[in-house]
Amino acid sequence: RRVSDPEVIKSWCENIELDSRLPLLALHEGKVVAISSLLQNKGGWKRHIGRISQSILPKYRQKGIAGKLVQELVDVARMAGLQKVEAEFIDKQEGGQKLFALLGFTHLLRLEDYVQDMQAINHDYVLMGMDLKTDEEYAGMG
């Protein structure tokens, strides 16, 4: 499913499962220009890890929108008690990797020619992640 497809976004909005997928949208003149999502597995060996995915229209890149959406989702993940967040990229998504690095993510893994794009061209798979630390000042406050 292509996250830039308006029908995919519409389906997500109509079937929101906030306990496992939290989407944040950026709108301009009533049009979705960016979407970021925090995905969480409620069971299994990755239940403590959230995954952030993002898509932003090229015209709206380099304007600070993506960084604000990602930072908001990192904060939500921390408040939800997740211990880590991760993000997946292909090698040519260098701008996204740089943004996530600026926000505190580190490169965890790179698998050469592991994934294919929509045109069946092989790319390196890149996994970035961040450990979420609880602010000691607020720990234990309910």
Residue ranges and their predicted role:
Residues 86-89, 101-123:
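Conserved catalytic-core motifs of GNAT/GCN5-like acyltransferases
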Residues 18, 48, 81, 122-124:
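Residue-level preference for beta-strand/loop junctions
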Residues 70, 77-89, 99:
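Conserved GNAT acetyl-CoA-binding A-motif
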Residues 51, 95, 102:
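Amphipathic alpha-helical recognition patches that constitute DNA-binding helices
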Residues 2-59, 131-133:
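Acetyl-CoA-dependent GNAT
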Residues 60, 64-72:
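Conserved acetyl-CoA pyrophosphate-binding loop and the N-cap/start of the following alpha-helix
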Residues 50, 113-142:
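C-terminal "cap" of GNAT-fold acetyltransferases
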Residues 7, 94-95:
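Short alpha-helical
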